[in-house]
Amino acid sequence: AKVLMPIMEERGSGTLLVTSATAAMRGNKNQHSHAAAMGGRRMLCQTLNAEFASKGIHVAHIVVDGMVDAPDTLGKMLGEELFQQLRETKGMEHDGLILPESVAETYYYLSQQHRSAWSHEVDIRAFSDTAWWNS
C-alpha cells in the first residue's frame, strides 16, 4: 500500500485487493498471532478506504474462508501424495474445496466494479458448510 497508493492517487484510480483468512472475522484457539495479523489486514483496508475512496481508489478486503484446492495451500498442509490421492478420489468439484479459478473470477469482478457500488469486503467460501475433511 505504501508504494502503490501514491501511484494510484496520482492516476486518480486504482484497485487494491487484500487477501486474508477466516481469522480476520473470528478467532480460534491457539491462533492468537494469526488472528491479530488477519484482523490487522481487515482494519488496514477499512482505514485505506476512509483515506483513498474519495480519490478514486477502490480497496477491498477478501476473506478466503476455506481450503483452496491448490498444491501450494492444500498440498502443503496434507503433503503431495495425500493431496494427489484426495484429488483423484474426491474430484475438483467437491463441495468442501474452493477452486482457484473461482477465486480468480471474484478478484477480477472486484477489480472491474463501478465506483458507484464498490464492494469493500467479500467472504469467499464453498457452498457447503461442511468441509470435505469433516464429512
Residue ranges and their predicted role:
Residues 71-74:
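A short local structural element in Rossmann-fold oxidoreductases
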Residues 9, 15-41, 46, 50-54, ...:
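Catalytic loop of short-chain dehydrogenase/reductase
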